[in-house]
Amino acid sequence: MSKSGKKLTQKLKKNLPVTGPQAPTLYELMQWYCLNTNTHGCRRIVVSKGRLRRWIWISLTLCAVAVIFWQCALLLMSYYSVSASITVTFQKLVYPAVTICNLNPYSYSKVKDRLAALEKETSQTLKNIYGFTEPLIRSKRDVGVNVENSTEDIFLKQIPLYRLESVKGSQLVVSDLKTKKRTRMSAKVIHRDAESVQDPGNMVGFKLCDPKNSSDCTIFTFSSGVNAIQEWYRLHYTNILAKISMEDKIAMGYKADELIVTCFFDGLSCDARNFTLFHHPLYGNCYTFNSAERGNLLVSSMGGAEYGLKVVLYIDEDEYNPYLSTAAGAKILVHDQDEYPFIEYLGTELETATETSIGMQLTESAKLSDPYSDCTMDGRDVSVENLYNKKYTLQICLNSCFQREMVRSCGCAHYDQPLPNGAKYCNYEEYPSWIYCYFKVYKQFVQEELGCQSACRESCSFKEWTLTRSLAKWPSLNSEEWMLRVLSWELGEKLNKNLTKNDLANLNIFYQDLNSRSISESPTYNIVTLLSNFGGQLGLWMSCSMICVLEIIEVFFIDSFWVVLRQRWRNWWENRKENQAEDTPEIPVPTMTGHDNPLCVDNPICLGEEDPPTFNSALQLPQSQDSHVPRTPPPKYNTLRIQSAFQLETIDSDEDVERL
């Protein structure tokens, strides 16, 4: 083909009409898209010559589209899997708060007047069960309290003690530990120490009944009489303390200068003024070092045993309650300054006559909240009210939820948890059935029937101290004599006694190093990463950009919709016109003329046969109803032919150009 022919062909193709979105059919729309798209595969399908090449490009394009859908599905699954990555960093930190408690909550000499009747019944019960004599029980101290002789045991009457002798189905054979009377009864048995009873004759427990329904009773059994007596004593002890004011309980506890004998921090001397009072319902007066209530937080200058907190504690074992505290020593807890010290759950015990060295390592954790986890940032989105007025923790939420259910079900609050607004602590005088109700609510709480475990969530950010403990005998044999003499002389005015090593406990708590471990979560996939990966997959498999994606949306969704809609509208309109033409009746042409013509009845211009109409009057005459448009097809001229814009016909000669 000559150069002039090629130029003419290009000019004709350029000037041919391109319909695009206005294409009458989907086929022409797809053909226009494939010729004009930036996606190479679709264009090669149209312009390739030969059926084999065309099918190859169709297969490759479809495979690329399938791979894109597969990879994008994997990306979406990764995005909605809400996985998180963990970052570990190390940084320096301040010294934590350290709470110290004596295992004996109250000095016995200060509380014995309130517990005299309970102690009398307890010792008498032990004598009835095991044959203990009075001097054996009180060999280490003299109670020194005159208790009025009374034949009525009020504590055993409120909570009677039994020995479980045999179990036959639902029938129990028990013997009263006071009267030795055997009784057969029907009651539920709850084993506090074991799930099954191997030897019922060794089981000791107490019976609780619902005052409103005397037949509804439960016997709580223990595998050892020691545990049964302690639990029975603790219930009455709690009932007595619930009626004592906070001021009196603080006065009955240990003072800071009585508990803290010596103190050193970071190589410098400290004293009781560096400790803050914290009254615990179970451990009495506890003291917190570095609580941040007295000013700035303390910081360790270096890591190691020489730069931590060193204290010598006075345990005063002679003032221990024998039925309440069976272990002698102290209990400590390392915690953050704004956290409540749950020392009964997380505390570490210290032995007497022992030096306890504790190395600390802090780990700070920060989790992602919803949708990555079910944690809460500050507890405001938790339905349970915080009764502790401290930073939210899971344990605070669980205890607050239990106390709320206790008040709702029993009408009073348990002594171990803070008192809600408008509630009172449980006691026998005002709430006779509170113990039975307490065990019933506690059983529901343990079995997760109260909904507390589902309502409470973990905190997203928290601090955790890993403790490494080591023990050493203290003081040594060579230093015991002079050290105890010096300490006895310094505390002589307060103690009026010579100290022994069993009265003291030594604590050394320090950072192993000044680095802390920080664990934080970050989303593995976010919206930016998702879009970036989508773009990478489209560009890798189809050389497609965001503009190409918009083209696909425009052509395959918007333009295709309008093309189909126009086709349906055109078909409907043509069918409607054909139906109207078929339903229209043919009106015959009237043969009458002049005044006899019914068309001229109301027309004043109608003329007779003898009067030919003028030009103006003829224009005003009504038209004939049976006039038809001629349906003769137009002549076929070669000059009226129009070639399709998408016809890729080649022009090989000037004759073809002239023919076009």
Swiss-Prot record:
Q: Which NCBIfam families does the annotation name? A: ENaC (TIGR00859)
Kindly report every residue range on the membrane side named Cytoplasmic: 1-55, 559-660
Provide the family line: Belongs to the amiloride-sensitive sodium channel (TC 1.A.6) family. SCNN1G subfamily.
Per its record, what are the GO molecular function terms?
A: ligand-gated sodium channel activity
The annotated subunit structure for this chain is: Component of the heterotrimeric epithelial sodium channel (ENaC) composed of an alpha/SCNN1A, a beta/SCNN1B and a gamma/SCNN1G subunit.
From the UniProt record, list the reaction(s) this protein catalyses: Na(+)(in) = Na(+)(out)
What protein does this entry describe? Epithelial sodium channel subunit gamma
Please explain the role this protein plays, according to its UniProt record.
This is one of the three pore-forming subunits of the heterotrimeric epithelial sodium channel (ENaC), a critical regulator of sodium balance and fluid homeostasis. ENaC operates in epithelial tissues, where it mediates the electrodiffusion of sodium ions from extracellular fluid through the apical membrane of cells, with water following osmotically.
**Chain segments annotated as transmembrane:** 56-76, 538-558
Cellular localisation: Apical cell membrane
* Keywords from the named record: Cell membrane, Disulfide bond, Ion channel, Ion transport, Membrane, Sodium, Sodium channel, Sodium transport, Transmembrane, Transmembrane helix, Transport
One annotated GO biological process: sodium ion homeostasis
Q: How is its activity regulated?
A: Originally identified and characterized by its inhibition by the diuretic drug amiloride.
What topology does it adopt in the membrane? Multi-pass membrane protein
Q: Which GO CC annotations does the UniProt entry carry?
A: apical plasma membrane; plasma membrane; sodium channel complex
The SS bond pairs are: 101-286, 209-217, 263-270, 375-460, 397-456, 401-452, 410-437, 412-426
Q: Which residues lie on this side of the membrane: Extracellular?
A: 77-537
Pfam family membership, one: ASC
